[in-house]
Amino acid sequence: MVFRRFVEVGRVAYVSFGPHAGKLVAIVDVIDQNRALVDGPCTQVRRQAMPFKCMQLTDFILKFPHSARQKYVRKAWEKADINAKWAATRWAKKIEAREKKAKMTDFDRYKVMKARKMRNRLIKLEVKKLQKAALLKASPKKALAKGAAAAAAAAAAKVPVKKITTAGKKAPAQKAPAQKAAGQKAAPPPKAQKVQKPPAQKAPAPKASGEKA
């Protein structure tokens, strides 16, 4: 890209730092390789010598003679409408946005975050609608088939799945006990059966030493 911003009489510059930071000035005369005589009649900057390192050249150029007086500079400035043109540039908008961001509080940052989330959600919804419309327009048969498959899958997901035993057979459905009508007494629980103990076997008495076995 060819460089087109040169130091010349009538060039409008942005003051980046110093006592007049953030203001626009016009170069009236070049003093030497380090300084220039500038004037800002519409930005409250008096005519003075200013170093080049605190100026950033813009694309705007005013037409007035060399070392012109302030009234000629003012007339050329107002005729070119420099203030309105500068406010419409991306450069000025970025500076303004940076200043606003520096002044934001925590609550302001929270509101910005919520607004961004809502914006992104709306954008996603619109993109999905456009994609669906484009799909229907490009291949309506495929879109219908895809919709039918999705409906079948949704219907299959709603059908309850029956339990299958380890042997591969279906488990028998357990019937719930029927509730008795009001007024009927509930059957008593079955009594526990007594378990009969086997008769105890007596040990044989020891024989006398003289007796034969």
UniProtKB/Swiss-Prot annotation:
GO function terms (MF aspect): RNA binding; structural constituent of ribosome
UniProt keyword annotation of Acetylation present: yes
Pfam families, per database record: Ribosomal_L14e
Residues with the Phosphoserine modification: S139
Region (Disordered): 166-213
Superkingdom in the source lineage: Eukaryota
Protein location: Cytoplasm
Region of interest (4 X 5 AA tandem repeats of Q-K-A-[APS]-X), residue spans: 169-188
Sequence repeats: 169-173, 174-178, 179-183, 184-188, 191-193, 194-196
One cellular component (GO) term of this entry: cytoplasmic side of rough endoplasmic reticulum membrane
Keyword Chaperone: no
Record-listed N6-succinyllysine modification sites: K85, K202
Positions carrying N6-acetyllysine: K79, K85
Residues joined by cross-link Glycyl lysine isopeptide (Lys-Gly) (interchain with G-Cter in SUMO2): K124
Region (2 X 3 AA tandem repeats of K-G-Q): 191-196
Record GO biological process: ribosomal large subunit biogenesis; translation
Family named by the database record: Belongs to the eukaryotic ribosomal protein eL14 family.
Role summary: Component of the large ribosomal subunit. The ribosome is a large ribonucleoprotein complex responsible for the synthesis of proteins in the cell.
Subunit structure: Component of the large ribosomal subunit.
Protein name: Large ribosomal subunit protein eL14
Organism of origin: Sus scrofa (Pig)
